[in-house]
Regions:
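Amphipathic alpha-helical segments that form the core helices of the histone-fold
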Residues: 195-202, 213-219
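S-adenosyl-L-methionine
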Residues: 175, 204, 220-222
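An accessory alpha-helical subdomain
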Residues: 141, 145-147, 152-190, 197-200, ...
Length: 232
């Protein structure tokens, strides 16, 4: 309720979601003088986002998330949202670093590449654990994801997701091997796809930038379109 009050003081409208219905009386009291704040008691991960967005103008998401839903919630907006302008969320600091990581670093992973196709990511502020009571076991950070239309264009969002998943299937294996396994390609097909995307034969997935992964996904999409035996 505290965050919602602050948002209501500066925003025209605030649509808040809370999963715990036991908080209804507390929030009713806390937000009694905030007529522009509307609280829906529902698990946001089960909300029909497309239906919700049909009723909304472009918006910003602000949240202090339970850490266990951070990735699925962020990916909902990355994969489904048409109107989110930005996400400003507090997350574990190691998760924030993964959101913002560069290719080839230990923090760089599938979620980094997934986010990068739609949004830029930056750490706005680090929040040490001593700022909370009771003191948690981890530090936190406020991270901002800013959505940009066609930030990294791809021919198929699904093929990009499949390519990212394949790239990080196993960090110990080459991307060629991962493509063979994930896309059911012959080794020759995998090599041809890598060559067409200007990716070295022995490259590992975690060394490719999101733009390189997008190029590779377009090549793989063209193979699918030509009805090469790659399962959908």
């Amino acid at each position: 309720g505290t965050l919602t009050r602050e948002l209501a003081a500066s925003a025209k409208e605030v649509f808040a979601f809370e999963i715990d219905e036991k908080l209804k009386p507390v929030l009713a009291e806390t937000l009694a003088d905030c007529p522009n704040a509307q609280v829906t008691f529902k698990d946001f991960l089960k909300v029909d986002l497309a239906a919700l967005e049909r009723e909304l103008a472009p918006y910003t998401v602000v949240a202090n998330l339970p850490y266990y839903i951070t990735s699925p919630l962020v990916m909902r907006f990355v994969e489904e949202s048409e109107k989110a302008g930005a996400l400003v969320i507090m997350v574990q600091d190691d998760v924030a670093k993964r959101f913002c990581a560069e290719a080839g670093t230990p923090e760089y992973g599938a979620i980094t590449a997934a986010i990068a196709r739609r949004a830029s990511a930056e750490i706005v502020k680090y929040v040490p654990r001593r700022m909370f009571y009771p003191v948690p076991n981890v530090d936190s950070a406020v991270v901002k994801l800013t959505f940009e239309r066609d930030r990294i264009p791809v021919r198929s969002a699904k093929c990009y997701r499949d390519t990212v998943r394949a790239a990080f299937l196993s960090r110990r294996k080459t991307l060629e091997n991962n493509l063979v396994n994930a896309f059911s390609l012959t080794r020759e097909q995998a090599q041809a796809a890598l060559h067409a995307a200007n990716v070295p034969d022995k490259a590992r997935g975690e060394t490719l930038s999101p733009k390189q992964l997008a190029h590779l996904s377009d090549v793989l999409f063209e193979l699918r379109e030509k009805q090469v035996t790659i399962p959908h």
